[in-house]
């Protein structure tokens, strides 16, 4: 674990409870869904309960501290809150049963509304070159519609609402039209011929593009199955296989830069949670691809990714707890001095 050089350094990377911490809600909520899907109900219940607590702390924390404000430059944080609410809502009927489909719809509605606002404001800032230095966090507002698309397809399956299927397809296209180009630009900025390399504090965000890869694979399988035609199903499978190919180099980059940064003592920040949700989306995509193709080893790969995600959740939780406790102790010492 990284050792902080001072309490002040931790204060700089530990914002108050609020949307900046919503990566934890995203990761824990999705983990609970995946554990239930793969037959670990007791552990799934534990993580779902934890996700509920995290959601309450994040929302309550924002109501108290109002940090961050709802401004364009901090839309990535609000995009995380959007995806966290959608992930929590999606997990509820999966983990606790069909009685909570209504709760899922409410979470999806709120999360999607916030996400579309974040998407609109941030894509405008990027196009106008007002989003600052390129970073993988640029992609957070752009991936939000894809997360909403997956849940919309599931809502369509349950409630049998044709309009929801077209909403799902539209949200899918919204991310596909923007995120790949933006991520390509960021990769070129960090790893191109004239690049300086990715800063230590930004290394956890290298997982974010994998979130689009995994989430779009899952969405493509659900949308293809919902349309029902052989062509739609085949297109979804082909899309998933192509995304699977992209997973190899992008995953290798994320593993290398993130683990190297941790071993070099990168200071903890909420960005470490970026190593959780994207891995979970890959697991979800592999699981649905297994269902679409009947290829069982896709499901085994999904299980491996759950193990990796669980490892990242544990590391992020322990490192975060240590960081918060050191900050509290530091403040107490300064007050007693």
List PLM regions with ranges.
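Structural signature of hydrophobic alpha-helical transmembrane segments
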Residues: 42-56, 102-116, 165-181, 237-247, ...
């Amino acid at each position: 674990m990284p050792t902080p050089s001072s309490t002040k350094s931790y204060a700089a990377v530990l914002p108050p409870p609020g949307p900046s911490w919503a990566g934890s809600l995203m990761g824990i909520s999705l983990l609970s869904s995946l554990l239930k899907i793969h037959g670990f109900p007791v552990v799934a219940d534990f993580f779902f309960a934890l996700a509920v607590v995290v959601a309450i702390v994040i929302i309550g924390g924002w109501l108290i501290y109002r940090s961050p404000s709802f401004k364009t430059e901090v839309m990535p944080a609000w995009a995380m809150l959007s995806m966290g609410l959608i992930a929590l809502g999606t997990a509820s009927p999966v983990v606790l049963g069909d009685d909570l489909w209504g709760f899922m719809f409410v979470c999806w509605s709120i999360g999607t509304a916030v996400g579309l606002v974040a998407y609109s404001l941030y894509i405008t800032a990027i196009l106008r070159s007002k989003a600052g230095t390129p970073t993988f966090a640029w992609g957070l507002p752009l991936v939000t519609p894809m997360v909403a698309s997956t849940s919309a397809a599931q809502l369509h399956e349950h409630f049998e609402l044709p309009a929801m299927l077209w909403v799902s397809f539209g949200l899918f296209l919204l991310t596909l039209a923007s995120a790949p180009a933006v991520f390509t630009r960021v990769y070129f900025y960090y790893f191109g011929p004239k690049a300086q390399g990715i800063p230590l504090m930004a290394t956890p965000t290298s997982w974010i593009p994998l979130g689009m890869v995994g989430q779009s694979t899952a969405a493509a399988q659900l949308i293809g199955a919902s349309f029902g035609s052989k062509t739609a199903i085949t297109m979804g499978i082909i899309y998933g296989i192509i995304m699977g190919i992209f997973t190899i180099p992008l995953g290798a980059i994320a593993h290398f830069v993130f683990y190297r940064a941790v071993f070099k003592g990168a200071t903890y920040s909420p960005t470490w949670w970026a190593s959780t949700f994207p891995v979970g989306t890959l697991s979800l995509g592999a699981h649905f691809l297994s269902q679409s193709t009947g290829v069982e080893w896709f499901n085994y790969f999904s299980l491996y990714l759950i193990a990796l995600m669980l490892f990242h959740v544990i590391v992020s939780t322990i490192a975060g707890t240590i960081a918060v406790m050191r900050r509290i102790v530091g403040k107490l010492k300064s007050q007693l001095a």
